[in-house]
Swiss-Prot record:
Residues 110-171 form the SH3 domain. The gene is NBP2. It is found in: Cytoplasm. Interacts with PBS2 and PTC1. GO terms for biological process: fungal-type cell wall organization or biogenesis; negative regulation of MAPK cascade. Pfam families: SH3_1. PROSITE patterns: SH3. Negatively regulates the high-osmolarity glycerol (HOG) pathway through its negative regulation of the HOG1 kinase activity. Mediates the binding between the PTC1 phosphatase and the PBS2 MAP/ERK kinase (MEK). With PTC1, regulates endoplasmic reticulum inheritance through the cell wall integrity (CWI) MAPK pathway by modulating the MAPK, SLT2. GO terms for molecular function: protein-macromolecule adaptor activity. This is NAP1-binding protein 2. InterPro entries: SH3-like_dom_sf (IPR036028), SH3_domain (IPR001452).
Length: 236
C-alpha cells in the first residue's frame, strides 16, 4: 500500500513538472509573438509616415499637348524639388526632340531620278506600287534590301518597287522623251485657232487694206509733183 502511494506521488510530481515546462514554453511563445507583432506595427507606422512625407507637396498634372500614350502626358509638381523636376523635364524634352528630328539619309541612298519599268509588278502589300512594263516612275531614294521608293508619273501614288524591275533613265534620254510628248490640249487649241480660215480671211483683208493705203500715198505724191511743176512753170 505504501509503495502504491509513493508511485502515485511520483507520477503526480512528474505531471506537475511537465505542465510547468509546457506552460513556460507557451508563455515564451506568447511573448515572442507579442514582440514580433509590435515590430511589425512599428514598421508599418514608419512606412506610413514615410509615405505621408513623400506625398506631401506633390501635385499630379497632365499635359494635353501630348497623347495619353506619351509619357510626357502625365507628370507631377513638387515644390521642394522644383529644380530637380526642371532638370528632369529638360532631359525628357531633349529626348523627345531627338526622337522628332528628321532622319538624314546617306548620299548613296538618295536617287531623285526617273526610271522605266522593265517588267510588270503586282503589289502584295499596301505600301507597294503597281508597275506595268514601260511605265515611267520617279525614284526618290533607296528603301533598302532591294526596294526603291517610287512615285507614279501622275504623282498620285507613292510606294515601294523592286530595284531589279526598273531601269534608270539618263538625263539626255529624259529630255528627248519630253520633246516627243504630245502637246497639252490648250496649246493645240491655240494653234488650231491661229490657222483657221476665218483668221486667214481677216488677215487677207487687212493686207489688202494696207496695200491700198500704200498705193494711195504714191498717187498723192505724184499729184503734188505735177501741181508744183505747173505752178513753177519750169521750162527747159
Amino acid at each position: 500500500m505504501a509503495t502504491m502511494e509513493t508511485t502515485t506521488q511520483k507520477d503526480t510530481n512528474i505531471l506537475k513538472s511537465g505542465l510547468k515546462k509546457t506552460i513556460g514554453v507557451l508563455n515564451e511563445a506568447v511573448l515572442q509573438n507579442g514582440r514580433e507583432v509590435e515590430a511589425v506595427q512599428a514598421g508599418n507606422s514608419d512606412t506610413m509616415e514615410d509615405t505621408e512625407t513623400t506625398t506631401i507637396g506633390y501635385i499630379s498634372i497632365k499635359d494635353y499637348a501630348y497623347a495619353d500614350s506619351n509619357p510626357l502626358h502625365y507628370g507631377y509638381f513638387d515644390g521642394d524639388n522644383e529644380e530637380d523636376e526642371m532638370v528632369s523635364d529638360s532631359s525628357n524634352g531633349e529626348d523627345t526632340y531627338n526622337k522628332r528630328q528628321s532622319i538624314t539619309l546617306p548620299d548613296d541612298y538618295i536617287v531623285n531620278q526617273r526610271a522605266v519599268a522593265l517588267y510588270d509588278f503586282e503589289p502584295e502589300n499596301d505600301n507597294e506600287l503597281r508597275l506595268a512594263e514601260g511605265d515611267i516612275v520617279f525614284i526618290s531614294y533607296k528603301h533598302g534590301q532591294g526596294w526603291l521608293v517610287a512615285e507614279n508619273e501622275s504623282g498620285s501614288k507613292t510606294g515601294l518597287v523592286p530595284e531589279e524591275f526598273v531601269s534608270y533613265i539618263q538625263p539626255e534620254d529624259g529630255e528627248n522623251e519630253v520633246e516627243n510628248k504630245a502637246r497639252p490640249f490648250y496649246l493645240t487649241h491655240l494653234i488650231t485657232q491661229s490657222v483657221s480660215p476665218k483668221n486667214n480671211i481677216d488677215n487677207t483683208n487687212e493686207d489688202e487694206y494696207d496695200d491700198n493705203d500704200e498705193w494711195e500715198d504714191i498717187d498723192d505724191v505724184a499729184e503734188v509733183e505735177a501741181d508744183m511743176k505747173t505752178k513753177l512753170d519750169i521750162s527747159d
